[in-house]
Structure formats: structure tokens, C-alpha cells
Amino acid sequence: MFKTIRCNQINDKLVNQRIEINAWVKKIRHHGKVTFINLRDRYDEAQVLVSDENLLKITSQIKMEYCIKVQGTLELRPLELANKEMKTGAFEILAENIDIISRCNELPFMIEDNNNANDNAKLEYRYLDLRREEQKQKIILRSKVTHIIRNYLTKKDFLELETPTFVKSTPEGARDFLVPSRIHKGHFYALPQSPQIYKQLTMVAGLDKYFQIARCYRDEDSRGDRQPEFTQLDLEMSFIKKENIFKLMENLMFTIFKNTLNIALPKKFKKMTYKHAMNTYGSDKPDTRYELLIQDMSKHFKKSSFNVFQDMLQNKGTIKALIIKNQAHNFSRSKINNLEEHAKIYKARGLYFAKIENNEFSGGIAKFLNEIKQTLIEAYSLANNDIIFFIADSWETACKAMGQVRIKIATELNLINKNIFEFLWIYDFPLFEYDEDTKSYQAAHHMFSLPKQKYIHTLESNPSKVLGEVYDLVLNGMELGSGSIRVHTRELQQRIFNIVGFKNEIAEERFGFFLKALEYGAPIHGGIAIGIDRLLMLMTHSSSIKDVILFPKNSFAASPLDKSPSRISNEQLRELNLTIENYKN
């Protein structure tokens, strides 16, 4: 009898015992009258020694990535022949039987070479890509993380509940994926962009602690690293303040990182307001792994002779500056020009600079700084070989553009420590933002967030000034999650709908079922959604979320693996009472 084991179960206790392993051929080497086979399964590797004449005939047919069954006796290898690069390198299996379970076609790329395949090939043959150790470990980590999340929240009395996948189309910003109904001709379901409304209804139902590992869908234009379907940890709690969410998520992240990467995060994360983040880092999701803080130099230029700055200040603009210490020699004119072009992408009018050389300003706008030279040197402890960059613009543009310059400089100067994880909370976000194109207000996050108490009575008079009970969790300069305390009365929810352009009749048609629920004793409640794909990407230092999704789409929301999306038959269209115009196009 042979004992069936996995590769990682090989140990001293099994020496001289007969074992069976089912696995894939990672490597095969023929050496005259012996053949060595390296097997790989999900758990580890093992080496097989084949010397039997009949078995050698079988091994002559075996190629890499064949799936085979090996039966044999486990032996210790001579000490000098032990493979120290393998956990099981001190052992080998002396083969007695070998069966080919299934053969493998010529490989589209080498499994052991991570760099020899383009992205499209890796997506088309994702099942082969996942045999690579690095890719496999990322998916295994994903499973561990979701398991930890479930255990942690269940112990905190949360209920794991499933909200509907077919829902009413209630636009939340991006386009909905629509599903035609065969039974209800001419009617459509939408796939949820998030479980937002349904988790709030769960609170109205009195189920005060909810969570879900939720699949979400957004029909967005192709850009960057977006996926049309993604996964988030969605949770909601009743009778809470934002501090309750902060504590819950800090402890959860601590548990995840400690039990997977053996990294002890701080028990409490940094916190800063949206305004402070924008002023200091030029971003509402700042990367705090490096300093490089933005300075507001407006007060120093109030009496400056530099008309560009003077005009901007008189028009209620601001002067933002970035001081790079002891690095002026690294900024050639061409590099500075590239930085200026980068700033202009983010709508800045220009990027100005001055260097400190021989205790004097030089280059750029140096001649306009003489009258405030000593003030700047003392205020910012300037020294030789420092360089200052300036942006004069509206507050929002100056902050955002300088924030992008900050990121580019930090990347080029290699200032970012990629081996640390810096979490922080951003809170007190604006509730609304004004769209210059449509001349109307939009929800900055979403329409269900509660305004801070002091703004509730003046919502309509100045929406731009209204701050909300909204918070984001940021990790290494990336928004990991977003949440808020929610509106829990119909009257206030209707007012917010009106501000963003949903008059009563439109709001009733789209959200009537939700507004009705708010009339039946809704509790104070709030929650957060954490992007699991994004979390895993950061934990594994991956360059793309595709690496941590089992079967991802490409950048065009298509699957090279199953060739979706695909056309459907005329019969299917007739059943749905649909016709397609210009099908050939």
C-alpha cells in the first residue's frame, strides 16, 4: 500500500515508507540510466529518482507540466547531494510506478520564467500563469485575508449577509451594467456598483452589524488599472460615530498584516483632515512614507514685485512651494522643464523655481526674490544646494498640481521606502463639488453621507462650504477604502437629492423605495467599503490588481481567456425582446 501525501508532507518519519504523490512536472532531467523529475503541487516540490528500465521508457514520454502520479519509496539523499534550495531537498522518491494522468501541449510561455510572456498571453492562459509560485502565493494570500476578515468580524457579532445582485438601476456615478429581463419585457436589472442602499436597508431592519465580501460592477471607460468587476469588504453598523469605524478597521488591518506578513502595524493610524492633506501633501490620499511637505508661501509674496504672484494673490489664489533640500544639483534645466509639463497636466499655469547657490538665489525667478530673500531663508532654514518650486494658482489647482510634482520628484529621487506600510485616515471631506461644465453640484463621495451638524441648517445656501461625516482609509498614497456616517431621515436625504439635481419626482422614481424606508425608524448608522483587490495588490507589492484576481479582465474590460464579452444569438435576442442596430460594427 502506498500512502498518498502532498509534497509538503515529506519528512523524516516517512523515510523508507512507500508513498504516492500526484503533481505536475516542474523539471525533468535525463542522465543516461537515471532520470530526475522535480514535481510541484500547490504546497511544495519533491524530487523523484527513476532508475527502473521500464519506468525510463515512460519518462522518455514525459515533458514539463505533464500531470503525473508517482508511487515509490522515500529515501534520504546523501548529505553532499541534498538540494538546499528545496524544503524537501534532503529527500527523494525512488520511483516504483509512474502514471501519466494527462499530457501538456507545447507551453505558450515558460512557467518558471516570470518575464517571458506578455500580459495578454498570461491572461489567456491564466491557469498556467497561476502555476507560477509568485502568482500562486498571491491568490493563496487572498484566501487567507478573506478568511481572517470573516473570522474577525464574526467574533465581533457581525452578520455576513448577501445583498441582491440584480437591483434597480440607481446611478451612483459610473454607468451601470444592465441585465435585460426576459419575463418583464423592456425592463432591466442593474448589477450593483456597491451594496450601498441595501446595507443601509439592513440597518433599518435592525440587523445592526452587517458585512459582506461583495462583488461590485462598474461600466467605466478603459483606463489604468480598473476592472469592470471587483471585490470589496462592505460593512455597516448602527448607533456609531466615525471613531467606531476607525477602531474596528485599525484592529482588522493589524490582525491581517500580523497573521499574513508578520508585520505589526501601529494600533492607531495617523489622522488628518482633507484640508490639511491637500495643503501639506497636495492630495486627499497622501503618501506619507516620505516627508517632502508642501509649504504655503502666500504671506511672503503679498508685497513682492513679481506680478505673476501678485496678480494671483489679488484674485484670491495661493502660492504653494516645495523645498527640496540639498538636491539642486540633481535638477537640470531639462528636468525642471519636464516637471513643469507634468504640473500643467494638472491644470497649473506654470511651475517656477529658484536654487540656492553661494547663499544667493539663482536661476528661474531668483531676481524677484531678492527683497524677501532673508525672510525665506530664515523661515524655511534654506541652505546652499536647496531648490524651491512654486505654483501660483487657485487653491485647489495649486494643491493638486504641486502634489503631483511632489510624487514625481519623490519617485525620481528614490525617496519612497517601498518596504513599509503607512496607513492614515482622511476625514472632514467636502460633501459637494461644483461641476463647471454642468454648472451644478455633485456629491463628492456619494449622496447618502451625513453633513456635519453645523452645516445642516445652511445646506442649500452654500453647498461648496459643507463638510460631511466622510472618511477615507489611505495606504501608501492609495485610497484603500471610503466610508461615512449616513443620512437617516427622509427629509434630509431629499434635501441632498435636490442639491445634486434630483428633484422630488426624479428622486421618487429612482430612490422611492429607499426614501420610504427612512420613514420607518431608521437608526443612526455608518460604514465603510475596503477594496480587497487593492489591499492585496499593496500587500504583495504587485504592479497591477490583475495579479491578485483569480481570472481578471484586461484593460479593455475583456477576457482573453473566455473571449467575453461575446455576441449572442438572434434567438436569445428575440427571447429578450431586443434588437441590435449596426451589429456588424
Curated annotation (Swiss-Prot):
InterPro entries: Aa-tRNA-synt_II, aa-tRNA-synth_II, aa-tRNA-synth_II/BPL/LPL, Asp-tRNA-ligase_1, Asp-tRNA-ligase_1_N, Asp/Asn-tRNA-synth_IIb, AspRS_core, GAD-like_sf. The keyword Aminoacyl-tRNA synthetase applies. One of its GO terms (biological process) is aspartyl-tRNA aminoacylation. The keyword RNA-binding does not apply. L-aspartate binds at E172, R218, H445, R486. Gene3D superfamilies: Bira Bifunctional Protein, Domain 2, GAD-like domain, Nucleic acid-binding proteins. Pfam families: GAD, tRNA-synt_2, tRNA_anti-codon. It is found in: Cytoplasm. GO terms for cellular component: cytoplasm. Homodimer. This is Aspartate--tRNA(Asp/Asn) ligase. It comes from Borrelia hermsii (strain HS1 / DAH). The lineage of its organism: Bacteria, Pseudomonadati, Spirochaetota, Spirochaetia, Spirochaetales. The gene is aspS.
